[in-house]
Amino acid sequence: MINNRILEFREILQPLYETLKNDCNSDGKLLPFVMHWGECFAEDIPVKIMFYGRAVNGWDSTWNIDKCFDLSDPDREFNKDISGLVTCSDGWFVKHSQFWAVIKQISQAFYPDDWFKYISWSNVCKAAPSKGRNPSDRVYNKTLRTNQKILEAEIKFWSPQFVVLFTGGDWSRGGDWSKDFLCHMNDGRMPKAKFEAMWDDEYPDRKLKVYEINGVYYIVTLHPMGKKLKPHGKCIIETINKFL
């Protein structure tokens, strides 16, 4: 059953994705991504965490925005249960993705059973190459304003306590994918970090930082790929507990 809150969220997002479509000129080499969430995420749960990556690495969707948001279409992007991704038959998302391995570790610290039902997953860049890899600087800059508005809509609608941004320290765009979005959420100014923690003794520059904007704690850290997973996840868990 689709409740009124989900319909309200669709009304907010759909026109933003029409704008994103125009930003990309319906380029078939780029495809849109719409956030996913578990069935319990919409409830009043004690720890609400939204996880963000940079951009989806290969995806199968459509620029037919009506189809993306058609609640009667089983192939739609909007309101598709995240459990279909993380519990698929071969278990690829968790077994082979370092990104998802860390998300699972963090989530299970708060929800040991059916952890995937209590989280949401999105990306700061909502349009990315269909064959994989991150969007180019040209695409990033062309879609930035709309991506900022979509992220703002997602966070304002769901009102999480924590937003974990696996977007720091990338080798392109000056080393960080988070600044443009944090500034947008903070009236155009980069907020000052209120806490930071090192999570890899071998590489002391690998730190997470915490920013508070309008009562939401943004935890900015490196993308997990190619990094130590357990200490990274442990540090994020400890940080969430610190600010609960």
Describe these PLM feature segments.
Residues 1-95, 144-154, 205-208, 242:
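Active-site and ligand/interface coordination hotspots across diverse enzymes
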Residues 1-13, 18, 137-149, 172-244:
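C-terminal capping/extension of enzyme domains
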Residues 38-39, 112, 167:
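Glycine-centered helix-coil hinge/cap
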Residues 44, 54-55, 123-124, 165-170:
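Short, well-ordered beta-to-alpha junction loops that form the rim of enzyme active sites
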Residues 48-51, 59-144, 222-244:
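Mobile, glycine- and charge-enriched loop segments
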Residues 51, 164, 218-220:
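Structural motif
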Residues 105-117, 157-160, 209-217:
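A structural motif corresponding to the C-terminal end of an alpha-helix
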Residues 151-169:
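Proline-aspartate-enriched helix->loop->beta-strand connector
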